[in-house]
Amino acid sequence: MQMDDKKHTASPARTSGVPIMDAEAIRRALRRITHEIIEQNADLKSVVLAGIPLRGVEITRRLAEFIRDVAKIEIETGTIDVAMHRDDVGTRAELPMVHASKLPLPLEHRTVIIVDDVLFTGRTARAAMDAISSFGRPARIQLAALVDRGHRELPIRADYVGKNLPTATREQIQVRLQNVDQEPDAVWLFKE
């Protein structure tokens, strides 16, 4: 959940980054998250995976595919836009990119798993919870992140994490996914 952290600005030069995860490590992390989701949710038919654009949507697609392969269940997915639910909308220099939210309704009596690429301050996750509440009141909300880099500003914790990666606040984590970025799957650490 890197939006708090210059996610949508120009990328630093690739030469200054350190690769943290390659495509195979990302695949293994997502497979592990898949098994944890299956173990923690007895009724997978009541689960909705809700990806935060952009990379959270692609990660959601991959998780749903893995769940289908492992549990033989077609899990419902959706997209949850957080742009207008963020607590920093009025203080940002640029307007946030707005994407359409699309969730399978109703959400009542269901478990919604918010999916994002990076969990940082927790503000994007909080905004996602606010956005979900505008669609209904799920029985439970869980959080999945490919990378948890720490530095929470809110009392939010991921239920499912691919990789815990302690960082300095001035460092930046970038997740690159082939279907989104037209670059090989990788997680990069950039020092400023």
Regions found by a protein language model. Give the residues of each.
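PRPP-associated nucleotide enzymes
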Residues: 1-192
